[in-house]
Amino acid sequence: MKSTSPTSDFNGQSVTNGKRTVKIKFIDYWSTLPEELDGYLVMQVLRKHYNVEICDDADYVFYSVMGESHWSVPDRCVKIFCTGENVAPDFNACDYAVGFEWMDYEDRYIRFPNYLFYGNSILPDMEHKHELPENWDLKTEKTGFCSFVVSNHRNKGRNAAFHALCQYKKVDSGGRYLNNIGEVVQDKLAFERKHKFSLRFENGAHSGYTTEKLVQAFAARTVPIYWGDPNVGKVFNKKAFV
């Protein structure tokens, strides 16, 4: 029977069940991360390979874009920047980074765009979008013209596109902003599945910055009307969206 008692490797670091123990900390993330940590992909990957101890006296500090605390992290700590937002890594501030940029920086950077963080929640639906259920009928399944689900007014170009498209035919807006269906939709994917098109604008146009917006549209079997990443065709079939 294998012992579960901690030992030490040649560097003096604790080893339990054949895994090295790493002390980490998350800062400058969204406020609900502590409650969502078990489902956070970075944490899931770490736990596959290490015994993870979350503490203030950390050796590795993961930080994001929701604050400035990372500037006061001691130099002895390894700082790892992770982002799903339209913010490029600053390698003067971090040792390693996980982001969306198309770049090669030896072992200090890995490209992992935003939509990959959604893993099993939407990617399987996107990958099997052409596998239609038996007796599926376009006329009965796609009763709406175009869907639009947003919660704020901050993207002026997106808002203008919505109003312009509404001049042609009604766009069903099911979010908190510009809602015209009488209620806020609870199941975004189910709502969008009823539509032929979906209006999809990123928060900014930057090479590599492709978020879940495009992937969700494919998962709902809609044709995205897309604006954002100018190099989106490196990954996605440009003939599949407008």
Predicted region positions:
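Nucleotide-sugar donor-binding catalytic core of glycosyltransferases
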Residues: 3-242
